[in-house]
């Protein structure tokens, strides 16, 4: 039986912790505890930073880790913020708000998949890799989609009064 090296395992444990916080964010959003839902997304972001730094520091980067990271990013910074914004701002509106949140989630998935494909192609290419990022990084997108919600927590209710504007803003992200 092959022995599992702790230094390879540790970054993946942190990634899976981030995934757990993303899942918890969805749970809290569905329970309408929006403050905790946002906090979970922020902690997932911290896990996302730490897992990569630790993997590079321990020289334990792996294909499994890269795939787990993308899946965790999609859930924590694509699905969770989309559901959170839908539940908090668009909960009573089914049309444009639903569409905007779906567009955000779908394009988060596409962006991460494109990144993974480019990363894989760069491994077989002899050329110097291009910048893999297309558009804004998914964690930044999560921060941007949450701005209208965080403004409402500070007493600025413009997001609830301008649903079409918020939907257009989300689609542009």
PLM-predicted stretches and their roles:
Residues 2, 130-173:
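C-terminal membrane-associated helical module and adjoining short loops/tails
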Residues 21-24, 51, 79, 107-110, ...:
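Membrane-embedded alpha-helical transmembrane segments of multi-pass integral membrane proteins
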Residues 1-2, 51-62, 114-131:
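Cytosolic, membrane-interface loops and tails of multi-pass inner-membrane proteins
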Residues 1-49, 54:
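Topogenic membrane-insertion module of multi-pass membrane proteins
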Residues 11-17, 57-115, 148:
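Multi-pass membrane catalytic core of lipid/isoprenoid biosynthesis enzymes
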Residues 48, 105-117, 169-173:
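Transmembrane alpha-helical segments that form the membrane-embedded catalytic/substrate-channel core
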């Amino acid at each position: 039986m092959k022995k599992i090296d702790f230094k390879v395992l540790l970054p993946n444990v942190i990634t899976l912790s981030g995934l757990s916080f993303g899942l918890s964010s969805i749970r809290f959003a569905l329970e309408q505890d929006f403050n905790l839902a946002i906090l979970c997304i922020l902690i997932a972001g911290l896990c996302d930073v730490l897992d990569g730094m630790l993997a590079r520091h321990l020289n334990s980067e792996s294909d499994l880790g890269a795939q787990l990271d993308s899946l965790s990013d999609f859930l924590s910074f694509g699905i969770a913020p989309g559901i959170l914004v839908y539940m908090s701002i668009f909960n009573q509106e089914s049309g444009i708000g639903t569409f905007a949140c779906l567009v955000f989630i779908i394009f988060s998935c596409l962006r991460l998949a494109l990144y993974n494909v480019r990363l894989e192609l760069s491994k077989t290419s002899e050329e110097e890799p291009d910048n893999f990022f297309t558009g804004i990084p998914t964690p930044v997108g999560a921060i941007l989609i949450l701005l209208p919600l965080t403004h409402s927590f500070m007493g600025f209710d413009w997001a609830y009064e301008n649903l079409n504007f918020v939907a257009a803003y989300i689609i542009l992200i």
